[in-house]
Amino acid sequence: MKRLRVFVVSDSVGETGDQVAKAVISQFRPGLENTVIRRFPHIQSEELIRKIVFLAAQQQAFIVYTLVRQEMRKLLRDLCEQEKIHAVDIIGPALQSMATFMEENPLETPGIVHMLDDDYFKKIEAIEFAVKYDDGRDPRGLLQADIVLVGVSRTSKTPLSQYLAHKKYKVANVPLVPEVEPPEELLQLDPKKCFGLIISPEKLNSIRKERLMSLGLNDDAIYAQHNRILEEIQHFEKIVGKIGCRVIDVTNKAVEETANTIIEHILTCK
């Protein structure tokens, strides 16, 4: 098998070119066997491009490049043609097509997609918030949250909190159990930002039985019994009635679908 050398040349970190190179090579060598991929990141000078092309010619390497500046792409392309080196421009054609479509010139700023902006930090902050105030751990977070989820056990409160956090919403959730009084903060918050998650007793019974079996426990425990589930749902309805919040039926709904319903409601109420 022929030894394959691939140079990934980028004016940023080179992640895009690296992933494209691996995706293409895997169509010929699924395990990337006998293949060497070398990344050349932050290449923003003519001198470095000339050195890379010289090295590629010596090692008979294939070049994949993602350079946003037109003059740098042209230089690399011309040098590769002179040295008869096979090279593929990953980003240039897309930039040119988009410029024509938008009737605008690109910024040609390397690494702009990786810049850490306000949105990035807001997302990280929201994710940390969701972890800190998950499962009613600290009721002080309820009044700070953008969204509060309440519901009985196994109604997808935690995965929904995490999904919404990735949309930059600070989410806290509280499990409602008949034996435990809900935190007083729950009755103090704006009901428009609180959502009760309800599920059919039959579906909840099935989910809880599966959960018990996955833990190696008997599926006839009180936790999964029909009467217990009805008691919890009745308690849930009593609490959400006091809060005056919207109730969403999550029976057979994907987390994404429920999240979209919540986001639409939040945006409508602004």
From Swiss-Prot:
NCBIfam families: PRK05339.1. ADP binds at residues 151-158. Belongs to the pyruvate, phosphate/water dikinase regulatory protein family. PDRP subfamily. GO terms for molecular function: ADP binding; ATP binding; phosphotransferase activity, phosphate group as acceptor; protein serine/threonine kinase activity. This is Putative pyruvate, phosphate dikinase regulatory protein. Bifunctional serine/threonine kinase and phosphorylase involved in the regulation of the pyruvate, phosphate dikinase (PPDK) by catalyzing its phosphorylation/dephosphorylation. It catalyses: N(tele)-phospho-L-histidyl/L-threonyl-[pyruvate, phosphate dikinase] + ADP = N(tele)-phospho-L-histidyl/O-phospho-L-threonyl-[pyruvate, phosphate dikinase] + AMP + H(+); N(tele)-phospho-L-histidyl/O-phospho-L-threonyl-[pyruvate, phosphate dikinase] + phosphate + H(+) = N(tele)-phospho-L-histidyl/L-threonyl-[pyruvate, phosphate dikinase] + diphosphate. It comes from Lysinibacillus sphaericus (strain C3-41). It comes from the Bacteria. It holds the Pfam family Kinase-PPPase. The keyword Hydrolase does not apply. It is an enzyme of class 2 (transferase). HAMAP family: PDRP. Keywords: Kinase, Nucleotide-binding, Serine/threonine-protein kinase, Transferase. Its EC number is 2.7.11.32, 2.7.4.27.
